[in-house]
């Protein structure tokens, strides 16, 4: 069974605590040594997802985290309850910052990712230079919110031509 790991600082730094699947209220997190409103990044391996809530009792603003999240945007240092849910393991497409599958890499499961969501998972705007779909269908979009020029990627792409460092949103299926 896979666990998520929550971190006190962005980029997986600072104090860390592993959480197996389950529901965690503010009191339960405190009992595990996690102070209120201190979580800034989360590692989420295949086989689990996390839903982070702004308020205790699984209320308020929330984000669903399905892959490693280097930062949590509006919920940064603003999480009071968490659900960790087991999910079927799915293949993940791999994105690279440099051509020829080099540089920083980020794996994402099937889904739709806007620019803000890509940044949550560690992909800065206009930084993707090569892709390994790993059996998935990937569509790169030049603009945020799935608009502008597109590039379908169904096999390993060591270079992206005109879309090199020019991607702001992604669909993976």
Curated annotation (Swiss-Prot):
What GO molecular functions are on record for this protein? metal ion binding
Q: Which domain of life is it from?
A: Bacteria
Q: Which Gene3D superfamilies match?
A: Crystallins
Q: What is the effect of changing residue 40 to R?
A: Suppresses completely calcium-binding
Which sites bind Ca(2+) 1?
8, 38, 40, 77
Region (Connecting peptide) residue spans: 87-90
Task: Give the UniProt family note.
Answer: Belongs to the beta/gamma-crystallin family.
The free-text domain note is: Has a two-domain beta-structure, folded into four very similar Greek key motifs. The N-terminal domain (NPS) binds 2 calcium ions.
| Protein's UniProt name | Development-specific protein S
Q: What organism does the record attribute this protein to?
A: Myxococcus xanthus
């Amino acid at each position: 069974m896979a666990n998520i790991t929550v971190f006190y600082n962005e980029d997986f730094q600072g104090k860390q605590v592993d959480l197996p699947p389950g529901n965690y209220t503010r009191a339960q997190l405190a009992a595990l040594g996690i102070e209120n409103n201190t979580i800034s990044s989360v590692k989420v391996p295949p086989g689990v997802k996390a839903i982070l809530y702004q308020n205790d009792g699984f209320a308020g603003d929330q984000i669903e985290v399905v892959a490693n999240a280097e930062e949590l945007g509006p919920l940064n240092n603003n999480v009071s309850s968490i659900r960790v849910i087991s999910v079927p393991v799915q293949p993940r497409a791999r994105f690279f910052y440099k051509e020829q599958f080099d540089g920083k890499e980020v794996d994402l499961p099937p889904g739709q990712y806007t620019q803000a969501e890509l940044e949550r998972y560690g992909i800065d705007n206009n930084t993707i230079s090569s892709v390994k779909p790993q059996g998935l269908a990937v569509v790169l979009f030049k603009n945020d919110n799935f608009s502008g020029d597109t590039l379908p990627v169904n096999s390993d792409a060591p270079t992206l031509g005109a879309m090199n460092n020019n991607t702001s949103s992604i669909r993976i299926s």
